[in-house]
Amino acid sequence: MSENQTEKLVRTLSGRVVSDKMDKTVTVLVERKVKHPLIGKVVRRSNKFHAHDENNECKEGDLVMIEESRPLSKTKTWRVSKIVEKARIV
């Protein structure tokens, strides 16, 4: 008999860090483009997610990938999986 191993698909999103003031937590702004149902114009919609950053590696302005995880607190159910691009220092 072969054992069937089913991997659960993990939701991943890409966004920009807008706040890193909390300990081990970052706020990530995720933007998406949707077509307005009545007007037909493409509109930007955004959501903010609190994500767990174990080593406090993320800084404000970084582009990160976040993945869904178990609830870590009242508002935190996402985890930073990788930093795609570091913010440019001006």
Swiss-Prot record:
One of its GO terms (cellular component) is cytosolic small ribosomal subunit. This is Small ribosomal subunit protein uS17. Part of the 30S ribosomal subunit. PANTHER family: 40S RIBOSOMAL PROTEIN S11 FAMILY MEMBER, SMALL RIBOSOMAL SUBUNIT PROTEIN US17M. Coiled coil: none annotated. The lineage of its organism: Bacteria, Pseudomonadati, Pseudomonadota, Betaproteobacteria, Nitrosomonadales. Pfam families: Ribosomal_S17 (PF00366). It comes from the Bacteria. HAMAP family: Ribosomal_uS17_B. The gene is rpsQ.
